[in-house]
Regions:
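Active-site micro-motifs of SAM-dependent methyltransferase domains
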Residues: 111, 129, 159
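Residue-level recognition of oxygen-bearing side chains
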Residues: 119, 133-136
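Helix-to-beta-strand junctions that scaffold the AdoMet/dcAdoMet cofactor pocket
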Residues: 131-132, 145-147
């Protein structure tokens, strides 16, 4: 859980309607005709199943994002892959694949329904690992950003698989920068407080414990850090290694291997 959870509030229908009117008038690419509901503008292809979302997918903004949004109170900020934001903001377009209460626009990954250079800022937090072609999404995000506009993206590096609904790519800092380096000046690259290594350690250890049978879970949870620092090859025959289920090996893998044959 990277950001603090906040109480979610229902969005006033009249307020939502006014915002959707503005989005249609000010931001949409020419010629697009979304399916408009009382809650969002839907650009998904006809027949695309719309599943009831898990309301747990969404957290409040970290302080740097709050400051960015506040600076552009009179403009527009795109939140790409917003999830279910606990605070509904009139200057933030919440784009999602799922109809959360805060969703304004439903759209797929590869082509955004907005005109060129219409957003003052863009944020995408823990999203790009879940898209099949993050490099294509990055190009689209830059396309709809105003010249001189700010884009903030964060992506996991050392995290277990967490599929909402799919998980394709974790990234190093160099990998994340490379998505935008050809079209943007990279002003900073850093590890946020919610991305420090201790979060990796606790998440991996907790999920490792979760995957073990009860007896081995109890044994594993009693190990000291010094025990775990022993060479992995020396621990390979331990029951807490041998009895970890296949799905947890994939979730927490150090390496995965694929064998392919050309059709």
């Amino acid at each position: 859980m990277p950001f603090p959870e906040r109480r979610r509030q229902a969005v006033d229908p009249a307020r939502k309607a006014r915002k959707l009117d503005r989005i249609q008038a000010e931001l949409l690419a020419p010629g697009l005709r979304p399916v408009r509901t009382a809650d969002y503008l839907n650009f998904l292809p006809p027949g695309t199943p719309i599943e009831e979302p898990a309301l747990t997918s969404g957290y409040g903004y970290p302080e740097n994002i709050e400051a960015l949004v506040a600076r552009h109170r009179a403009g527009w900020v795109l939140d790409y892959g917003a999830g279910n934001r606990p605070e509904y903001l009139d200057n933030v377009v919440n784009l999602e694949l799922a109809p959360y209460p805060s969703t304004d626009v439903m759209s797929g990954d590869m082509s955004l329904p907005f005109r060129d250079g219409c957003f003052d800022a863009i944020v995408t937090l823990a999203v790009l690992e879940h898209v099949r072609e993050p490099w294509s999404v990055a190009r689209e995000l830059v396309r709809v950003l105003k010249p001189g506009g700010t884009l903030i993206a964060d992506v996991p590096f050392l995290q277990p698989v967490h599929a909402y609904p799919s998980h394709f790519f974790n990234m190093t800092a160099e990998g994340l920068k490379s998505l935008f380096a050809d079209t943007c000046d990279i002003e900073s690259s850093e590890v946020p407080h919610y991305g420090r290594p201790i979060y990796t350690l606790t998440w991996f250890l907790q999920r490792y414990c979760d995957g073990l049978p009860p007896e081995q879970r109890a044994k594993f949870s009693q190990l000291r850090v010094a025990d775990l620092l022993a060479h992995a090859g020396e621990q390979a025959k331990q029951d807490y290694v041998a009895q970890l289920p296949k799905e947890f090996n994939f979730e927490l893998a150090s390496v995965t291997t694929v064998v392919a044959r050309k059709r």
